[in-house]
Amino acid sequence: MTAEEVADLRLRRYNATVVSLNLLNPDLMVLRVRPDFPRHPHHPGQYCTLGLGYWEPRVAGCQEETLPAGDETKVVRRAYSLSCSIYSEPGRLMRLEENDWFEFYIVLVRENPDGRVPALTPRLFALKKGDRIQVGERVTGHYTLDPVKDGDTVIFLGTGTGEAPHNYMTWELLGRGHTGKILNVCCVRYARDLGYRDTHTALMEQFPNYTYLPLTTREPGVTRKVYIQDLIASGELEERLGGTLDPARTHVFLCGNPKMIGVPHRDRDTGAMSYPQPVGAVEVLEARGFKADVAAIKLKGNVHFEEYW
């Protein structure tokens, strides 16, 4: 494909510009993109799509890709929850009207165990400031703070970049003066994967009702692996919260690895629910009196989830 053909495809297919890329480690970044269009009203916790053409370069060290004939002019897209850096400057929460960009928290997928070649993230990590990109004009999703009332306890449980929507939700809660306790748990493999750790530490110093709990499972020196499900079952989550888990006044938000979440399967004929194995957070919480959302029957519970996979 010639340079002129690539330039023409970019002109016709892209509608946003890369404002900044903050590479937190070789496989993790915070990406900000400015759309050509005015941002439509949306809610923290929702998502939109990012897209790049197959004609774009990929970073080195990723699974080898062989494109089928004709795919080189197509655009690959994926949905990403919107993230938020929460502060615009030390001690001052961001004001939405100050920014004209979307923020995304992205991990580089170098290869897939199932053999499917990662198409988008190796191209996203090859971007530079000023490059063009496609962003979906529609921000959507049901994973929002709508059911939360002031005074409710809010618990965010996320793995990896699944904390992205929780960052945005945290910003909204603190910005509107939420009086209930807020606990934000993020489980990652290594400490270097805690991309917003400094921000959360600063929030704890500024807001007495906010607690951040980072967990690492492969960090050298960690003698005991603690997964989110274990944290709930052992009672340690309540210790960190400083109170009991009361389903009547608590909302739990789960985002990340499907094995952590453990969404139950609903039998279409009988309506019976069955939990997957290994045990996920939904099963542990429902044993404590909580009830997960069931989209198929439009049931709104107090455990909400976004399968970020």
Regions found by a protein language model. Name each.
Residues 3-128:
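Ferredoxin-reductase
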Residues 185, 190-309:
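Reductase modules of NAD(P)H-dependent flavoproteins
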Residues 151, 173-182:
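Conserved S-adenosyl-L-methionine
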Residues 159-165:
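Ser/Thr-glycine-rich phosphate-binding loops at phosphate-binding pockets of nucleotides
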Residues 137-149:
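A short, basic/flexible loop-to-alpha-helix module at the beginning of a structural domain
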Residues 82, 165-175:
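Histidine-anchored nucleotide/phosphate-binding helix
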Residues 48-51, 133-135, 154:
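Generic structural signal for buried aliphatic residues
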Residues 153-155, 181-183, 251:
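Structural motif
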